[in-house]
């Protein structure tokens, strides 16, 4: 896919994600209207400059809680989904009022993971974004919490925003949060935590021994770990990603103009293809294949297909063309791919030579378990 909208070198596609902690007052859970108004002004100004802008907004559950007088985020799924339905309408009304004042049209786009799992629906979502951006509209995106089920949830809007940025092949992804940048530890509990301004590769984080923590705020779901995971998805698509303070939306324009505010993640110089990004991040893996060292080396170092001889163990139940994770013996994921055999058949041929497949299974199947065209390193 190529997101060509007669763009010039001076205009960009920009995805901005704002979390519940930035949208609401921490003490009451009520909307932080001044922050939202400044965000609307900033995004409208970016649009007026010819940029294509997408806003991924959390807050439906938090706003619903405030509207209903609930003092804490509900844990029961049915109640949370009901509260999200209340909050989403209120949230969109606020956005629509603010953007209308600025004469900027917006659109509500609610997504579930299943919208990205099926390739035809994935492409349909892409086409919808393409048309909205061509019309000069700012799509306001959220997970459809009211209907999403656990098995097909994004889990947090950091992941959703990265998948949207990957889908539309954005130039920038801004993850607005309640801290000003990434630190070597949580600065709220470790006063001497070291700020990190630039990450040239995700592997750098291990070298820096970043202790990001997974906990989110009281009202949100995304901690710093989810933002790093989101950055991994985005930079693989060639999207420059920035973590910065959500209370100061005007910093978005300053960053685009070259100021080094927040933490910047440099994009990969050679982005993964759109189809392989769909395999790696759009699909939900339903099984795991544990590989021997020879197969791992062939895949990682030589870009080879996976053969049955390299599979040591099969976990999960799946059918041909389902997505699976490829793991080392310790369970660390190294790749994902679309498998050519069901889990039942693969159990029978794992560890065997490809030429033995017809004798074992009674039919002539593919020589590969996963062809390299359907395999992507993660």
Curated annotation (Swiss-Prot):
Catalytic activity: L-glutamate + ATP = L-glutamyl 5-phosphate + ADP
S-S pairs: none
Classification via Pfam families: AA_kinase, PUA
Predominant subcellular localization, coarse grouping: cytoplasm
EC nos: 2.7.2.11
CDD domains: AAK_G5K_ProB, PUA_G5K
Residues given in the record as substrate binding sites: 58, 145, 157
Keyword Nuclease: no
One cellular component (GO) term of this entry: cytosol
SUPFAM superfamilies for this protein: Carbamate kinase-like, PUA domain-like
Domain of life of the source: Bacteria
Family: Belongs to the glutamate 5-kinase family.
HAMAP family: ProB
Listed name of the protein: Glutamate 5-kinase
Gene, per the UniProt record: proB
């Amino acid at each position: 896919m190529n997101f060509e909208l007669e763009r010039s070198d001076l205009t960009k596609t920009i995805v901005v994600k704002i979390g519940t902690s930035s949208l609401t007052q921490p003490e009451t859970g009520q909307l932080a209207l001044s922050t939202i108004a400044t965000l609307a002004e900033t995004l409208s100004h970016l649009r007026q400059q010819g940029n294509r802008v997408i806003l991924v907004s959390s807050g439906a559950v938090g706003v619903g809680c405030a509207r209903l007088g609930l003092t804490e985020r509900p844990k029961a799924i049915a109640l949370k989904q009901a509260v999200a339905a209340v909050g989403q309408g209120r949230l969109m009304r606020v956005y629509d009022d603010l953007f209308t004042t600025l004469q900027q049209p917006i659109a509500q786009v609610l997504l579930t993971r299943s919208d990205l799992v099926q390739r035809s629906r994935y492409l349909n979502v892409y086409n919808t974004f393409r048309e909205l951006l061509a019309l000069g509209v700012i799509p306001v995106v959220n997970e459809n919490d009211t209907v999403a089920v656990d098995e097909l949830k994004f889990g947090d809007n950091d992941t959703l925003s990265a998948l949207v940025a990957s889908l539309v092949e954005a130039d920038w992804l801004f993850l607005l949060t309640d801290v000003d940048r990434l630190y070597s530890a949580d600065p709220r509990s470790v006063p001497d935590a070291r700020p990190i301004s630039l990450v040239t590769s995700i592997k750098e984080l291990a070298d820096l021994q970043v202790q990001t923590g997974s906990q989110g705020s009281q009202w949100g779901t995304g901690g710093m770990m989810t933002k790093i995971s989101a950055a991994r998805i985005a930079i693989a698509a060639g999207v420059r990603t920035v973590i910065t303070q959500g209370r100061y939306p005007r910093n978005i324009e300053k960053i685009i103009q070259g100021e080094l505010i927040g933490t910047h993640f440099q994009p990969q110089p050679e982005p993964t293809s759109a189809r392989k990004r769909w395999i790696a991040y759009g699909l939900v893996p339903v099984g795991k294949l544990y590989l021997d060292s020879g197969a791992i080396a062939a895949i990682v170092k030589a870009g080879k297909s996976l053969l049955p001889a390299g599979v040591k163990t099969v976990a999960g139940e799946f059918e041909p063309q389902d997505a699976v994770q490829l793991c080392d013996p310790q369970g660390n994921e190294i790749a994902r791919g679309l498998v050519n055999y069901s889990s039942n058949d693969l159990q029978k041929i794992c560890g065997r030579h490809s030429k033995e497949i017809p004798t074992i299974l009674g039919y002539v199947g593919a020589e590969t378990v996963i062809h390299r065209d359907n395999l992507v390193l993660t």
